[in-house]
Curated annotation (Swiss-Prot):
One of its GO terms (molecular function) is tRNA binding. It catalyses: uridine(54) in tRNA = pseudouridine(54) in tRNA; uridine(55) in tRNA = pseudouridine(55) in tRNA. Signal peptide: none annotated. Gene3D superfamilies: 3.30.70.2510, 3.30.70.3190. SUPFAM superfamilies: Pseudouridine synthase. Belongs to the pseudouridine synthase Pus10 family. This is tRNA pseudouridine synthase Pus10.
């Protein structure tokens, strides 16, 4: 049997709907001369099973899911998933018979047609690069139980909402609160008696105090906190605050009153934190917030206590500290690469409290560990306040007064 005879015999088993025929034959004359016939009123398309003729019902199914979820969006992307071997097998065979080598398959057609319907009927905007929601059209062989449309009973709709990103600044007004969630050291976050089955080492975190207000407002799933650096648990963040971006995952409500969010967080945190300067940003902003430590500068207020009395010459030498070579501190080497990093001090102001205690105001490049700048960290920080005075010192109190990052 020749290839032509084989193709002719195969065409007797197939018929196409107008849309599938038009996909394969873009030229009307070619469609008129197609070796595969057009379906009649009793037939179903050999490729799409008449799904393309019932796209209005697919749209209604999408609309029903949007209303059920009460999901808000302005931009969208349509995705398709076909788990139906009959469709994929027949499409491949018909492409071979008709010598079709284009890329306008059934998935492309559904995406294009449904996108057009959503734009026209809902006034939404198709966005391939940065959609607010992704609408997945899933097609399988077996029918779905709760699909109300017999013609497309094997179609189901899933909608995923992409994250929203809100930038702001937080002030941490008390000590003893970490910035982000800290899994319990006993159960590793699983929940145990030691952590009251919360899975967390600390009851409150900056992230939790914000997310417990923002999640109900957005109907989001969870949050991820992106800070411009972080202060230690025993350190306060004062001044104008530390820049952060909070990422809300799977939000159903995207536009919330940020002024009201600020009021809620500030009034419900029992004086532990305050947030300000809230605004919506794109996902690119979280990277610039997190990776800004080298370009940024910070101002600290530190209390340094010395083993022996401090002289006026010691104070003079401390104020002259400039370039610091700092090896990764012992206390954080378990989570940071063991490297020597060079950081610059812009200015140090020293105020004597008593003969063995100084108040330091330090303006320095981001990424400098202040506690180790004072103690020397077993000579891993060179020079240090301890080494320059030949007098061992410890930081007994530390506050961050300012965090500056480039816009």
């Amino acid at each position: 049997m020749t290839e032509k005879e084989y193709n002719t015999r195969q065409t007797q088993n197939y018929a196409l709907c107008p849309k599938c025929l038009s996909r394969i034959y873009r030229n009307p004359k070619d469609r008129d001369n197609s070796i595969i016939p057009l379906i009649n009123n009793t037939q179903k398309c050999s490729i799409c099973n008449n799904l393309l003729l019932n796209e209005d019902k697919i749209f209604k199914l999408i609309l029903k899911k949007i209303k059920m979820l009460k999901i808000e969006f302005d931009t969208f992307l349509i995705a398709t998933q076909i788990n139906n071997q009959t469709i994929t097998k027949n499409q491949k065979e018909i492409y071979k018979i008709t010598n079709y080598h284009g890329n306008n398959d059934i998935k492309h057609q559904i995406r294009r047609d449904i996108s057009r319907l959503i734009e026209e009927k809902l006034g939404k905007t198709y966005d391939y690069k940065n959609p607010e929601v992704v609408i997945m059209v899933k097609i399988r062989k077996k029918p779905y139980k709760h699909n109300p449309y017999p013609e497309i009973s094997n179609v189901n709709i899933f909608i995923d909402s992409n994250p929203i990103f809100i930038e702001g600044k937080y002030r941490k007004l008390v000590r003893g609160i970490p910035q982000t969630k800290w899994p319990c050291t006993h159960c590793k976050g699983k929940g145990c008696e030691a952590c009251d089955y919360t899975g967390q080492q600390y009851k409150d975190t900056v992230e939790d105090l914000i997310s417990r207000e923002i999640l109900p407002m957005t109907n989001g799933n969870t949050t991820k906190f992106h800070g411009s650096g972080r202060e230690d648990i025993d350190v306060r963040m004062l001044g104008e605050g530390r820049p952060f971006v909070i990422e809300v995952k799977h939000p159903f409500k995207r536009k919330i009153d940020l002024k009201f969010l600020r009021v809620l967080v500030n009034s419900h945190s029992d004086g532990k934190i305050e947030i300000n300067d809230l605004k919506y940003v794109t996902k690119e902003r979280k990277a610039s917030i997190k990776n800004s430590s080298v370009e940024s500068y910070k101002i600290y207020s530190a209390i340094a206590e010395f083993e022996n009395g401090v002289t006026s010459k010691d104070i003079y030498n401390i104020e002259k500290l400039k370039t610091i070579d700092q090896r990764t501190p012992i206390r954080v080497e378990h989570r940071r690469a063991d490297l020597i990093r060079t950081r610059e001090i812009k200015n140090i102001e020293v105020e004597r409290i008593n003969s063995k205690k100084l108040h330091l105001i330090i303006k320095c490049q981001g990424g400098l560990y202040i506690k180790e700048l004072i103690s020397g960290d077993n000579n891993r920080t060179k020079p240090s306040v301890s080494s320059i005075t030949n007098n061992q010192a410890e930081c007994t109190q530390l506050d961050v007064l300012k965090v500056h990052i480039p816009e």
